[in-house]
Amino acid sequence: MLGRKKNPETVQTESKSVESKTHDPLRRLGVLDDEDVLLMLQGSKMMKVRSQRWRKDRRLKLLEDCVTVWCESSKTSRKSNRQQTFSVTEVECVREGCQSECLRRMTDLVPEKNCFTVVFRGGRKSLDLCCHTQEEAERWVRGIRTLKDRVSNMSQKEKLDHWIRGYLRRADQNQDGKMSYDEVKHLLQLINIDLNEQYARTLFKKCDRSCDGRLDHVEIEEFCREMMRRPELDAVFRHYSGNGCVLTTLELRDFLGDQGEDASLVHAKSLIQTFELNDWAQKNLFMTQNGFTMYMLSKENDVFNPDHTHVYQDMSKPLAHYYISSSHNTYLTKDQVTSASSTEPYIRALNQGCRCVELDCWDGDKGEPIIYHGHTLTSKVLFKEVIETIAQYAFKASPYPLILSLENHCSVEQQAIMAQQLQSILGKKLLAKPLSDLPLKQLPSPEELKGRILLKGKKLNGLLGKTESWTSFTNSSDEESVAGGNKKESKKDLARSASTKLSPELSDLVVYCQSVPFSGFETANQRPPSVITSFSENEALKLIKDSGKLFVRNNSRQLSRIYPSAQRLQSSNFDPQDMWNAGCQMVALNFQTPGEQMDLNQGRFLPNGRCGYVLKPEFLCDPKSDFDPENTGGGPGHIPTQLTIRVISAQQLPKINTDKPNSIVDPQVWVEIHGVSIDKARAKTQRIDNNGFNPRWDCTVSFQLQLPELALVRFMVEDHDHKSKNDFIGQFTLPFTSLRTGYRHVHLLKADGSTLSPATLFIHVKVVRRGVHIKTVSERIGKA
């Protein structure tokens, strides 16, 4: 006998158990009866496509957590295992048909209606797939979109619940629906916590009501509730609650007043109606501890001001009065020497709200202009394909004007082709003539240019005199040097660039962003507002140091674009804050390179609905401003402010070293101020050993700010390491002017800017301006 026949009742019970495991996440996501999601759970065979030569049959299947999609592969390495799955939370969008660069080149080899592309956030490559039927492709597209929308609309508490249940399934190694003590220890390792052995056993025994040495479904839930208790949050609740059990509307109103929010009874009642889960409490207008936790973890209580999540600033000012989200070498996927040129980075940048993208244009074969990093090993992409991509995605994330920064190295003939392609593809979106025939006194506003695409480039019959008008002059202050500063060819190439003629057709399309070299501020003041000058980072820093006031005044009426040094061959970035301090509008960064500089950029453009335009402080918009970014001991914008932040705790920080199951993070938190030089500062908490699940610091840091309007606040969490460099865990950056006071949660982001949900920091923020502080209710009745 090879094996014992299972009892039919046992088989039926196991079948129901498996079914219920799948139904739980379906029910929580509200997709229990969704036929598209049910198809995904069954799995489908389809073709994975990378090129015309690389096409492999794969089976894709949605796993039981209803968030993870598994792609069958014969590879067995740990890295490949990670790449075999993706979470719908990592998906930026799903594109139907042959919309990717790869699939567009294969329309004669694959049926377009059977294809779709999964585009991920961050640096992960897109996934091109071809199903056997059109219906199957449509159902997978709908299914992924449905799950993506449902997960993004979950409350923070629901996300935590879903997160912990996913780990429970992984920890239940024999999949019997119960957990032994060893499986519980495995769970603790998975969720990044190293509990004291005695405490873990005590907690296990406390929850083991059946006393059989294994936790069933109900007991596991109790164990998780105990694990996820937030004593620091409970303390805040008890402080405001008269009886320690519920908050009345009056008590909740007092709490809201201390938070610096709308402290009305109407607002307090609306929060109870929204976040209270208990029917009796909701009916009687009480908020229980669970309801309070739901509220505290919600976006309503986020550290970032929710009023700033939509366009709230005046968009009728001249373009020069705004910071403009700008990308450098937009076409590159990685470094400036060997990486691929592609349309994908344009899509990513535009979807992030970028409003100025760069096109490095060169003569291509067969009369077709191309885009690549000249005289390097980077691959090439057709100019036409890039413009088609821009036409499709230009205004998906923002309705405000998009600027195309042309680095023009093409012959007159191919420039004419560029002009024709720009007009035929972009159509009415392309601004080809001024909005008014009247002489230009100031640049038009983002509101006036809504939905329009502007060209930044050289112009004939411009400002350099008629005898010079047929030449596209190039110098280090106006155009980026070719090939990132290749010395062997730079003299020859620059000489050739200096005599490159400009096509009248292309010149005519340049309206409000005419590129001119910098010839001093006296000359700049005599030029119209429609000119723009590009500076390398080093040139800009020198101007800020030597002529800061003049630079600020110039930037109040004309646009300036700052680009990274040619020596940054790995596409690294400079600190954009110094340029923003001087009022520079277009501080172009390598969007393909994550890091602190891109964190700052994301934080700078987080407010105003992430539309890519943020109004500069008034003292940077005044043509007679006396503001000097290098000397900020007083003067315009000077508002002495004390910022005090208490870093209380963190929740659900992820494991960093996933290759080592026993590795648990030792987190510490940095709080950084990025602003004018006198305000720049950082402070850190102590580290907490072996606890990424619910570390607690209760550490207070304080900063003295002189120009709060220019300051960014960055929270960064890292894994402390004695032997090597600390590992980055997550961060969140926002303008000081968008920072909310009181008890707040900081929802952390990954290095690529995507969400690290459900990881959060719990903090308390206090702001005192000009030495005057109005005491909160808590401070009047006693310290919390």
Curated annotation (Swiss-Prot):
Ca(2+) 1 binds at D172, N174, D176, K178, E183. GO terms for cellular component: cleavage furrow; cytoplasm; plasma membrane. SMART domains: C2, PH, PLCXc, PLCYc. Residues 159-194, 195-230, 227-262 form the EF-hand domain. It is found in: Membrane; Cytoplasm; Cleavage furrow. Ca(2+) 4 binds at I664, D666, N690. Residues 621-750 form the C2 domain. Residues 506-621 form the PI-PLC Y-box domain. Residues 1-25, 473-498 are annotated as: Disordered. Binds 5 Ca(2+) ions per subunit. Two of the Ca(2+) ions are bound to the C2 domain. Its cofactor is Ca(2+). One of its GO terms (biological process) is lipid catabolic process. Ca(2+) 2 binds at D208, S210, D212, R214, E219. Its main location: membrane. It is a peripheral membrane protein. The C2 domain is a Ca(2+)-dependent membrane-targeting module. This is 1-phosphatidylinositol 4,5-bisphosphate phosphodiesterase delta-3-A. The gene is plcd3a.
